[in-house]
Amino acid sequence: MFYNKESDFEDDLVAVLKRHGWTDGVLEYPTEQDLISNWANILFDNNKGIDRLNGQRLTKGEMAQILEQIETLRTPLALNSFINGKTVSIKRDNPKDEAHYGKEISLKIYDRQEIAAGQSRYQIARQPMYPAKNKMLNDRRGDVCLLINGMPVIHIELKKSGIPISQATNQIAKYAHEGVFTGLFRLVQVFVAMNPDDAVYFANPGEGDFNSNYFFHWADFNNEPIAANKHVGQDEWKRFASDLLSIPMAHQLIGFYTVADSADGCLKVLRSYQYQAVNAISDRVRTCKWDEPVPSGTPGRPGGYVWHTTGSGKTMTSFKAAQLIAGSKDADKVIFLMDRIELGTQSLLEYRSFADDADDVQGTENTDVLKAKLASIDPKDTLIVTSIQKMSNIKAGEGHITEEEVKKLAGKRIVFIIDECHRSTFGEMLQDIRRSFPNALYFGFTGTPIHEENRKKGSTTSMVFGDCLHRYSIADGIRDGNVLGFDPYMVLTYRDRDVRQVVALEKAKASTIEEAQADPAKAEVFYHYMDPNQMPMGPMETQAGERIKGIEDYLTSAQYAQGTPHEGKVVEDILDQFPLLSRGNKFHAMLATSSIPEAISYYRLFKERAPQMHVTALFDPNVDNSNGAILKGDALQEIIGDYNELFGKDFIIPTWPKMKKDITARLSHKRPYLTVDQHREEQLDLLIVVDQMLTGFDSKWVNTLYLDKIIDYENIIQAFSRTNRLFGPDKPFGTIRYYRKPHTMKGYIEAAVK
């Protein structure tokens, strides 16, 4: 349907909302004071009992106390915790309540678990009046505001047919700039901008920027966007309203699917694919028949796996799934499991930053602490973050753990959520866990699942975890603008002709071109390898799946060894490109190398050729007695010493893990480096790695990966995805520059992104 008048569209939207759960009345043209009085009435109805308001209504002074708390909390981030904190405390000043006069009482305001039930009230405010905060400005009117228990939590701005929703989002941003969303309206958590054919929703950024990268379209289970200007005139807005804005969904959106991220200092809202995954997992747990025997075969109940592209917010999705399960009481323990000990730091911090209370997420310093938290019946110990290494040590005969203790723990209803499950599941450690906890339910999260074509040790992801519960591919993510695309560049450190000639001469067993040409047999071989039509630079695959070798297959590692021109050319290219790609040191970069000795060599080359650059290296610090141990030990001391001098730190080899945390925080601009972009002397320009940080590390401030190693399949997507977090117009894509066997890598990249 085509709407010539916005008011007609508003009438129809309100009618749809009333049919989908907003059944407790429509307030027409309310002022802020009208809404405060309405809230006071609902608070009275929900708290009139003898232990709370004792049958006596709230006074203006008592409502002013609540509004003062809202004004003090100020940000949508803090107010999300206020709303979801269930209660608010006031000091009674109503003399009619003799029992509580002058005393503090607690009032219930909202319960995320009372979905379309209990005391929850759902109202619509039409054309609410927003008082101007500046005498120079007029009062403003909104279009529609949705109230849960009297609190204005969703603000909707409408436009008639043919008017782009950018006008609605700009209007919301303008109102915010004018101070419209203050007072009671600070409680708004989610904004919606819509016309009959297009609609987006986004978290209230408060005093932050309104970034269109975080305006989301809603989509169905198959990631097909709803009301995204694709089906003009077909009333797509009705699907949007009945899906996202309906009750129970809108109640859950505020209670469960917003995230107050204390690390980033902002309120976030889940995208539709994150909701679909969380919902699928919580449904699977809710319907699990714990008393029924486990299916035969591998110990443990297969819950399924979530395939969401790297960079799409898997940690937040897995956290929300874990939080919902923990809050639902459908399981006794929810354990978020990571593959590597070092990844635990970032994931634990992220989990805690997402939680209502950091204490709701339990870390595990060692196996004894983990055992104690597993045995605990304290609700605070329900949600545990630990590593696969520690968890695999919870077995009979390990340390001081008895078989009886393991049996008792295994008797609990335990849900495992395994991060980066393509990596962590293919080893003996997961089997140990499954043998110790055969009744547990196992879920996996991965951006790069193992399929038949890249399976390891005979196992695909579905063999280990069961069905794919939800898929959101890299193509979906790039299409929706939820992750950035990649811009890969093949950089030749040797000319193709020179490489081809070296291989051709070697195969012809000739030292010079003249020697090859002088002997017909040698000439035939020589020209075979020199002809691109007969011998490609990189390997090829026939339609039958047969691999045909390319010139680069005949190169030895000596071509790229330390001290060769290759290393110098890589450094030269990075130094040439870095000022432009980093946008004048705004963004950081990573250089991935093939070995620790190479990482050390590159580190020293950068020190020598670019002393002004802030460079460090990160690799496994364990020094053993193998060849190269002395080099590695000396290099560690050098790298740590340089880092200490550069940034005023005092790390030593035994505190290397703390240095890694510091590097992670510095690259991510997380505490204590939230404002590092304003302090050049605190910034790290380039991090040199071998394997560490190429998986599981997230920072929107990293925009370039320099790659001097051969990787394939899922490892390509994992490594490239270090660069694909959204930032803004200064970061349109993640840049990749690759150097080693570049034609081979080009083929691998094309295969990986198919």
Predicted regions and their residues:
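Conserved segment of the helicase C-terminal RecA-like domain
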Residues: R722-V753
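Inter-Walker segment of RecA-like/P-loop motor cores
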Residues: S353-G399
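ATP-dependent helicase/translocase motor core
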Residues: M1-K333, E342, Q346-D357, P379-K380, ...
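Conserved helicase ATPase motor motifs in RecA-like P-loop NTPase domains
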Residues: T309-T310, E420-S424, S436-N454, G481
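Conserved RecA-like ASCE ATPase "motif II neighborhood" in helicase/translocase motors
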Residues: L383-I418, R423-D432, K670, V689-D691
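Interdomain helical connector at the RecA1-RecA2 junction of SF1/SF2 helicase-like NTPases
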Residues: H231-G233, R455-K586, Y603-E608
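A short beta-strand element within the Helicase C-terminal
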Residues: L686-V689, M693-Q718, G734-Y738
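Conserved C-terminal RecA-like helicase domain
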Residues: M535-V689
